[in-house]
Amino acid sequence: MTLLGTALRPAATRVMLLGSGELGKEVAIECQRLGVEVIAVDRYADAPAMHVAHRSHVINMLDGDALRRVVELEKPHYIVPEIEAIATDMLIQLEEEGLNVVPCARATKLTMNREGIRRLAAEELQLPTSTYRFADSKSLFREAVAAIGYPCIVKPVMSSSGKGQTFIRSAEQLAQAWEYAQQGGRAGAGRVIVEGVVKFDFEITLLTVSAVDGVHFCAPVGHRQEDGDYRESWQPQQMSPLALERAQEIARKVVLALGGYGLFGVELFVCGDEVIFSEVSPRPHDTGMVTLISQDLSEFALHVRAFLGLPVGGIRQYGPAASAVILPQLTSQNVTFDNVQNAVGADLQIRLFGKPEIDGSRRLGVVLATSESVVDAIERAKHAAGQVKVQG
């Protein structure tokens, strides 16, 4: 039996978001639909989820003491990380003291660090992955590259959105790649992973829900990446029945090994009928924003339903759908959007995230489209996103 209180009343059910970006905003909205009290936390003021939360706090989430203080102040029933850059050792302590970390503190800690999740997948679960080596010095980095061979990819073990990554084709790139990786890590200079290049036909995100009524899968989401960030995503990605079966089996093993209830974004490479594990996020995935238009329950609704202990039941996918990001480049603390009328219509929607400022390139919104085919849905979403003029 699941008991939910009413927000702002003594018996309220309280959810604290750690990270309040566009994904956290949609989680907050889904919590609001169920009368749940939402506290949004981030490193900067006026983050998107703060716009739709009951209260908000600005802290350095890598500071364990600051994190404990805000948790003790608000006394949440659920702590929901939206990003990786969090003091995960403190989350483990808080969980040991009886707090509910979503999906669980171990999953948050393992997936914060590429080494943790890669060793779990490849060494413990024996899943197919790219070849890899870890290095924490320039000399060991050179040895790792020599062992993997060219071409290869170097990434900080702790980074996101493509920061610090280099595709290495020759020895001439090694010094620069090492320095770039040191600059791109979330915790500053440190350890890197060197990966062999995987030959694949396409990448997918398999949104996988672990809930009280078992493990559920959304239709596979295809996506296109550029500079480490997604530009378009679509659903469903066509793949062979055998490849889909293998993808679901890999995703099931990963989420059950990580533990807890919630939605996981499992990233996979697909080549014919072969499937190779890439990464996993124990939370809604940016490529999954397409589910805001493609499913009866978005990835955000599924995440909330799962961590509150509610059954998922089934997931209905409506047909070909796509998302395309609005990614301007400018500097402004007073952003406006023109021509928005060209990004809405029949089977066409827009989400503007409400980020308070931009300095360079930043994802500020997404256009969602459905159509008779995935190809047409992608083109509709891209065209409409290109019509929106961002000014500041």
Curated annotation (Swiss-Prot):
Residues binding ATP: 114, 155, 160-165, 195-198, 203
UniProt keyword Ligase, yes or no: yes
GO molecular function: ATP binding; magnesium ion binding; phosphoribosylglycinamide formyltransferase 2 activity; phosphoribosylglycinamide formyltransferase activity
Catalytic activity: N(1)-(5-phospho-beta-D-ribosyl)glycinamide + formate + ATP = N(2)-formyl-N(1)-(5-phospho-beta-D-ribosyl)glycinamide + ADP + phosphate + H(+)
Pfam family name, one: ATP-grasp
The protein's role, per its UniProt record: Involved in the de novo purine biosynthesis. Catalyzes the transfer of formate to 5-phospho-ribosyl-glycinamide (GAR), producing 5-phospho-ribosyl-N-formylglycinamide (FGAR). Formate is provided by PurU via hydrolysis of 10-formyl-tetrahydrofolate.
PANTHER family, per the entry: FORMATE-DEPENDENT PHOSPHORIBOSYLGLYCINAMIDE FORMYLTRANSFERASE
Protein known as: Formate-dependent phosphoribosylglycinamide formyltransferase
Lineage of the species this protein comes from: Bacteria, Pseudomonadati, Pseudomonadota, Gammaproteobacteria, Enterobacterales
Annotated gene: purT
